[in-house]
Design a protein with these regions (language model features):
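Bacterial N-terminal signal peptides
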Residues: 22-31
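Terminal, non-catalytic domain-edge segments
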Residues: 39-68, 186-211, 237-244, 248, ...
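Solvent-exposed loop and edge beta-strand segments that line ligand/cofactor-binding
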Residues: 53-61, 101-115, 164-177, 243-256
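Long, well-ordered core segments of solenoidal/helical folds
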Residues: 68-80, 138-155, 206-225, 277-294
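Eukaryote-skewed repeat-based solenoidal scaffolds used as protein-protein interaction platforms
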Residues: 136, 140-143, 147, 164, ...
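Intrinsic, low-complexity N-terminal interaction/targeting segments
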Residues: 82-83, 87-88, 96-103, 152-163, ...
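Long, hydrophobic/aromatic-enriched structural stretches that serve as scaffold segments
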Residues: 103-130, 138, 142-145
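N-terminal carbohydrate-binding/catalytic regions of secreted carbohydrate-active enzymes
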Residues: 66-117
Length: 381
């Protein structure tokens, strides 16, 4: 009797375990599904437009990339270009999409702040992976826009259609013209994201790049017989250095000139004029180093940016240098030139990039490598 009771009890315990396991299976399965769903959502989480060109190659074939590419088509103006300072990765509601459509005829297409050429790079990556005709059509319209916008002398204005004021100057500021030229160079050289571009456009892109290089060479600033670097803007007719906003004076640019030299060093078979332009600019960068200081952000409230002495600091370069004296210059919204960044108002001191270390990579790595390839045997001091 006792044995039979124990046997029954054992059966009941096994049945209980099976029942509990049966209850747990859907719970565990739901937990796993939730975990996988969370991972999928995290992987496909919306991104900011600032990060749109920083994604892994395969991401440009994702549904999120397709959504953003379609946003870019929505934002593209009838001119073929795009406006600036808009987060075009934001999910467009029906109302917002309707508002965007109303701006199609706006004349705010620009190459400032990465606009237009950045959208085109994105579209090219998506089209390469997905092959959707609407993305190709949008990109080709963008290429046509850039080709139309170029001045006869090879430069590009900040806005096209032309916007009166400093916007019509040839604009190196913030990589504007160099961003355009890098893209057109990729088109002309049949790089993998642009192999679908027709031969006629490729040929026109190549000629536009050649004209742009000619413009750069002619615009290089000569001081007392020596070639130096470039201003952030140059006059669209005379090619002389030109001012822009109140705090952006005629000057030698320590920042924008870096991108120009990097582009010139990318020319496969540079002629003597290009080589001379590069070597002259590099010599200027070496002479314009600001040593023994750091440009730091304070920890107080409000935050401030200050120059502090530090003999062990790596070299810096000022954003702008006075052409005749080669002294760093700074300015506030009153447009008065100062020789110390501490002398301008807090708003401009903290709201603008007055120093850069970008030329360090040029001097320490890129130029020596270029020199070894183009001028073997020449020693870089």
């Amino acid at each position: 009797m006792v044995g039979r009771i124990g046997y029954v009890r054992t059966l009941m315990q096994k049945a209980k375990r099976r029942f509990l396991i049966a209850l747990m299976i859907p719970v565990v399965a739901f937990g796993c599904w939730l975990r996988f769903d969370q991972l999928a959502q995290a992987k496909a989480a919306p991104i900011n437009w600032r990060d749109a060109l920083k994604q892994p190659r395969e991401w440009y074939g994702s549904s999120e990339a397709l959504r953003i590419a379609d946003n870019l088509i929505a934002y593209q103006r009838e001119s073929g270009g795009w406006p600036k300072n808009i987060d075009m990765a934001v999910d467009l509601s029906e109302r917002l999409r309707s508002d965007v459509a109303k701006e199609k005829r706006s004349d705010d297409s620009t190459i400032d702040n990465g606009a237009t050429y950045s959208q085109m790079i994105f579209l090219a990556r998506v089209y390469t992976l997905k092959q959707l005709p609407r993305h190709k059509e949008s990109l080709l319209r963008g290429i046509d826009y850039l080709l139309r916008a170029q001045y006869d002398n090879g430069g590009w204005p900040q806005y096209y259609p032309i916007k009166k004021g400093y916007y019509q100057h040839i604009t190196f500021n913030d990589e504007a013209m160099m961003g355009v030229m890098r893209l057109l160079r990729d088109v002309a050289s049949n790089q993998r994201d642009y192999i679908f571009v027709d031969e006629a456009r490729r040929e026109r892109a190549g000629k536009a790049v050649e004209k742009g290089i000619e413009c750069i060479l002619k615009a290089q600033i000569v001081v007392r017989g020596k070639r130096t670097v470039w201003c952030a803007q140059h006059d669209e007719v005379t090619l002389v250095p030109a001012p822009a906003r109140a705090y952006e004076h005629v000057s030698l640019s320590g920042q924008e000139s870096t991108g120009i030299v990097e582009f010139l060093m990318g020319i496969e078979h540079p002629d003597p004029r290009v080589i001379k332009a590069i070597e002259s600019a590099v010599a200027w960068f070496k002479s314009a180093q600001v040593k023994g200081v750091r440009w730091v952000e304070t920890t107080g409230t409000p935050v401030d940016h200050v120059v502090v002495a530090d003999q062990n600091a790596p070299p810096l370069w000022a954003r702008f240098y006075e052409i005749d004296t080669n002294r760093p210059i700074f300015s506030g919204r009153d447009s008065v030139i100062k020789y110390s960044v501490a002398e301008i108002e807090s708003e401009r001191r903290n709201g603008y990039r007055w120093y850069t270390d970008a030329p360090a990579k040029l001097l320490n790595r890129d130029y020596p490598a270029w020199l070894k390839k183009v001028r073997p045997g020449k020693k870089w001091l």
